[in-house]
């Protein structure tokens, strides 16, 4: 027998999340980010022991009424069917008292990992549907999260992996792309909320990165105020990394390469055959790098006369053992020449390792709505065409592709809920269209 109540001790609520694999979207700081939602905190107890915690956000909509949503679901032992049953009964009563149209949650329970079925995911689908939840089969209508994420494990057993050891699992091309960043004039800075407050140009640079990225990959980026709010509310658990192309540094590196070539040319005059071949390789390598350098400088000069250009950036949150890459991208300048996206993501991975995280979360990709399987679960979740490249990039870092069980709805008022379900796609499209028109 379990008891449930509205939780007012948010410190205890957050402590439970941190100790039991909760996510930043489930903690009390999230209400200060999602200010258009009304937040209520619930906890479940077995005697005096806290065994469940859930942040329920409420939004009132015309026609649809009150929509309740728990991002990431409840933090609890999902294999405990009795706990889930009693929690569901409790939520049904709360919905009646609050006049809620529905309660939506999307538990981070994997249905497939790298394409392999997970029995626990199929069992969870059956448990939830037996308890009265309905699976939302239309991915494009999901409330907030896509039902996929790409994770890089940072531990093997009790041993933390180094960033270099993780990279050994990646393709050779990934390791090469990371290495050449610093060799071609890239430098990075890590900023906090305080830094952004003192120097607004930092956020302006990041927004320029995100605008280029969103236009290139056909999505709508968050604005600077929202990103600043995330840094503020997760102060001490967040950072903003910006990667710059520094022309002065690149010029210095090129001068060093040319000196190396001159030395090789001088030694060639007296070198024996084997040594001469090695020197020839050095000279050819410098010539090739010089060609890249000249293209880089020409492209950068055409883009701006500034000596330092922000070419990439990423905002991350580190919470409860997970380093989450929320937003990130690159400018449309010297992207391929410097491999700035690889360099940025390597730095973000290093930060997660440095902070002792167990998982590095590369985030989600937008997926297509699948056919349902025979047991009623979601079929294979395939990235939309404009996100295929992003998916391939994230997978190249040896990330595991988790397909979650999806979004489940407990319906309180059928008429209002199905009106909401019918109107939501139209409302989402109208919102995106309006944002794009305003930005043009």
Each predicted region: which residue ranges?
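A conserved beta-strand-loop-helix scaffold within acyl/acetyltransferase catalytic domains
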Residues: 5-64, 109-115, 132-143, 149, ...
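Short linear capping/connector segments at secondary-structure termini
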Residues: 108, 187, 365-367, 408-412
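Short, basic, helix/turn surface patches
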Residues: 165-170, 218-222, 400, 429-440
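Acyl-donor binding region in acyl/amide transferases
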Residues: 64-145, 309-312, 318-397
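Membrane-proximal basic amphipathic "stem/tether" segments
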Residues: 266-285, 414-440
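Conserved catalytic-core motifs of GNAT/GCN5-like acyltransferases
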Residues: 134-143, 401-413
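Aromatic-rich peripheral "rim/lid" segments of glycoside hydrolase catalytic domains that contact
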Residues: 393, 400, 407, 416-417, ...
């Amino acid at each position: 027998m379990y008891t449930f109540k509205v939780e007012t001790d948010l410190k205890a609520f957050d402590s439970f999340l941190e100790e039991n694999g909760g996510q930043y979207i489930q903690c009390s700081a999230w209400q200060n980010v999602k200010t258009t939602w009304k937040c209520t905190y619930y906890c479940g107890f077995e005697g005096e022991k806290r065994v469940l915690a859930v942040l329920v956000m409420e939004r009132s909509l015309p026609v649809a009424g009150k929509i309740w949503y728990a991002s990431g679901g409840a933090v609890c032992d999902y294999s405990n069917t009795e706990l889930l049953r009693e929690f569901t009964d409790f939520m049904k009563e709360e919905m009646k008292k609050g006049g809620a149209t529905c309660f939506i949650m999307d538990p981070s329970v994997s249905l497939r990992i790298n394409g392999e079925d997970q029995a626990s995911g199929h069992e969870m689908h059956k448990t939830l549907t037996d308890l009265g939840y309905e699976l939302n089969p239309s991915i494009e209508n999901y409330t907030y999260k896509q039902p996929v994420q790409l994770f890089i494990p940072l531990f093997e057993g009790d041993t933390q992996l180094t960033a270099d050891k993780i990279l050994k699992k990646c393709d050779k091309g990934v390791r090469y792309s990371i290495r050449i960043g610093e060799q071609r004039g890239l430098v990075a800075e890590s900023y906090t909320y305080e830094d952004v407050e003192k120097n607004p140009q930092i956020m302006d640079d990041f927004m320029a990165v995100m605008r280029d990225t969103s236009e290139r990959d056909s999505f709508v980026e968050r604005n600077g105020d929202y990103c600043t709010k995330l840094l503020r509310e997760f102060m001490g658990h967040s950072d903003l990394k910006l990667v710059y192309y520094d022309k002065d540094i690149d010029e210095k590196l090129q001068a060093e390469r040319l000196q190396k070539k001159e030395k090789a040319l001088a030694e060639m005059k007296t070198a024996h055959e084997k040594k001469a071949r090695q020197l020839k390789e050095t000279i050819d390598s410098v010539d090739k790098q010089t060609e890249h350098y000249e293209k880089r400088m020409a492209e950068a000069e055409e883009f701006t006369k500034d000596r330092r250009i922000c070419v990439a950036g990423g905002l991350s949150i580190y919470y409860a053992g997970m380093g989450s890459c929320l937003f990130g991208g690159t400018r449309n300048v010297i992207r391929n020449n410097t491999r700035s996206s690889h360099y940025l993501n390597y730095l973000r991975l290093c930060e997660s390792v440095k902070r002792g995280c167990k998982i590095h979360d590369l985030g989600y990709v937008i997926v297509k709505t699948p056919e349902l399987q025979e047991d009623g679960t979601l079929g294979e979740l395939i990235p939309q065409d404009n996100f295929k490249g992003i998916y391939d990039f994230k997978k190249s870092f040896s990330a595991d592709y988790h397909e979650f069980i999806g979004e489940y709805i407990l319906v309180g008022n059928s008429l209002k809920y199905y009106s909401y379900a019918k109107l939501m796609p139209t409302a989402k499209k109208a919102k995106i269209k309006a944002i794009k028109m305003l930005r043009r």
